[in-house]
Amino acid sequence: MASAARPAPSPSDCKKCGSHVAPSLLACPGCGALAHAATLTTLAASAESAEQLGDLTAALSHWRDALDLLPQNMPQYAVIHERIAGVSERVSNGEGKSAAATPEADGVRQVWKNGGVSAIVIAFLLKFKTILILLLTKGKLLLLGFAKLPTLFSMVAYGGYYWSRWGWPLALGLLLSLYVHEMGHVIVLRRYGVKAGAPIFIPGLGAFVMLKQVLNNRRENARTGLAGPLYGLGATVLAYVAYRVTGRTTFAAIASLSGVLNAVNLLPIWTLDGGRGFVTLTRRERWIAAAGVAIIAFLFHAPIILMLAGVCAAVAILGTPSDRPDPQMLALYLFLLAAHAGIAILAHSAVATAGV
């Protein structure tokens, strides 16, 4: 008597042991074989090739995609995680094709490496000079969010909320300033090969960017966090320049609001950008930040900024510091706070003088 024919294995069956592998599983429950072995091989080859070509952003993107297809208990997961950390470190140091190729940007990187007080001052000037260049060279990415319906709908709701209170010119200016700020996060996330959605705006509160992949380490988190206020500074500067050129106090009001919102976002607490920027600072650097903020408050005659200095001091005492110094983030943090607060104060004075 002939035996019944064995059914052909389905596409979801393990090729090694024949066990059924549910679509949500990353490894066979029977023998532990990787469910996406072929895809992982392709991603690894693409990542290696991208690294050799100097395209570190593409390499990180491929490695992160591979990490998503691996169970965390597999040894390959730890290996790729370390590989991502190494490539990410190179990106943080300004390596790779996506790094700005302007002489100004090269000067900033060289000054950071040399260190010193005078070097930091020069770096501030060079970086301030390149803010508008950043906005222009990243224009394509900045416009990316407008192609996403959820972003557009939330922008309309956000703009309408403030339009009803302050009128459309101020509402539109504030909306665009916040948009540039949030897209700064997205641009740097993509530089690190991290998939992220376009910004979603919440009327009366602000906006946020949904991550589709996790950041690998503190340095990525800090640089992504301060990217918002850095790009936001470009919007703040543009609004203030528009006021100086046209004399229209609406632009001064936009610059003032943009500066204040970005400065508040630099509070080193919770998930605010300042809190993310602080994660790579040692305890000593956090105390330097607190002292620097106090000096800014004194120079600008702004007692309210002393509150921020107090928060920095509290974080220096109570927070968990990094064991690795990060003078770049310390200097950038103080620069952004001074720039946003300074422009906000100047713009507010213009609005107050005009009696608006």
Regions found by a protein language model. Name each.
Residues 36, 73-94:
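TPR/TPR-like alpha-solenoid helical repeat scaffolds
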